[in-house]
Amino acid sequence: MLKTVHQKAGRHTRPVRAWLKLLWQRIDEDNMTTLAGNLAYVSLLSLVPLIAVVFALFAAFPMFSDVSIQLRHFIFANFMPATGDVIQRYIEQFVANSNKMTAVGACGLIVTALLLMYAIDSALNTIWRSKRTRPKVYSFAVYWMILTLGPLLAGASLAISSYLLSLRWASDLNTVIDNVLRVLPLLLSWISFWLLYSIVPTTRVPNRDAIVGAFVAALLFEAGKKGFALYITMFPSYQLIYGVLAVIPILFVWVYWTWCIVLLGAEITVTLGEYRKLKQAAEQEEADQP
């Protein structure tokens, strides 16, 4: 009886072990951690230009003036580690300085922000091992659409949420809205990763694989955010070594960790499809044997 149970358990766990082995093999072959390091470096160079462009877009639409402040607080409270307040002050100071730049300098900021999106495009297509390339004009249009529509849609969603919460007559509804807003960071991460894994690769990505990979990445991102915040508060080694400059390595480690999660979600997405193809090929080969 016990032997039968072990045999059944082995049959159920064998596909999981095979998939995990394939996942690890792809992570090693794609040099995922090196790609994450490259993206972290480009992200740090593009962070201030990207935020400057986003805030400039909000400034161009007066109806989003109040929402831009809420969006700033929401991003730094939900997508940054425990030192988000310090990082926010520094970044806002850098952005304020960038607003004094000339038109040529502003164009340079936009180009730098677009370079980050190009780096993301290259990294994800490296993981998908896609040989196809998009026309440059089409790629630029996609990058620009993400750069402009993304922040505006986020601002619109926050404006709607604030409006609903301001309706005092809907006291029964406020409890439901509070619960929705509590899971909003996870939901936004899930949707963002799903769009990233579905749109950016130049090859066709099965929707269910993108949903699963995005969900795992979103869960790891939320868990990593809380774990990183706990590490910073419980083991303040960076503050002890670097003092007031501790925000620099903390930000770099957090950005690197974030890109590791994003690329791991991409590896999971592509491995699900590859494992399914390998399994179907093995079953077909077994069926063809006399």
Curated annotation (Swiss-Prot):
<keyword id="KW-0997">Cell inner membrane</keyword>
<feature type="transmembrane region" description="Helical">
    <location>
        <begin position="44"/>
        <end position="64"/>
    </location>
</feature>
<protein>
    <recommendedName>
        <fullName>UPF0761 membrane protein YihY</fullName>
    </recommendedName>
</protein>
<keyword id="KW-0472">Membrane</keyword>
<keyword id="KW-1003">Cell membrane</keyword>
<feature type="transmembrane region" description="Helical">
    <location>
        <begin position="140"/>
        <end position="160"/>
    </location>
</feature>
<keyword id="KW-0812">Transmembrane</keyword>
<keyword id="KW-1133">Transmembrane helix</keyword>
<feature type="transmembrane region" description="Helical">
    <location>
        <begin position="210"/>
        <end position="230"/>
    </location>
</feature>
<dbReference type="GO" id="GO:0005886">
    <property type="term" value="C:plasma membrane"/>
</dbReference>
<feature type="transmembrane region" description="Helical">
    <location>
        <begin position="183"/>
        <end position="203"/>
    </location>
</feature>
<dbReference type="Pfam" id="PF03631">
    <property type="entry name" value="Virul_fac_BrkB"/>
</dbReference>
<feature type="transmembrane region" description="Helical">
    <location>
        <begin position="104"/>
        <end position="124"/>
    </location>
</feature>
<dbReference type="InterPro" id="IPR023679">
    <property type="entry name" value="UPF0761_bac"/>
</dbReference>
<comment type="similarity">
    <text>Belongs to the UPF0761 family.</text>
</comment>
<feature type="transmembrane region" description="Helical">
    <location>
        <begin position="244"/>
        <end position="264"/>
    </location>
</feature>
<dbReference type="InterPro" id="IPR017039">
    <property type="entry name" value="Virul_fac_BrkB"/>
</dbReference>
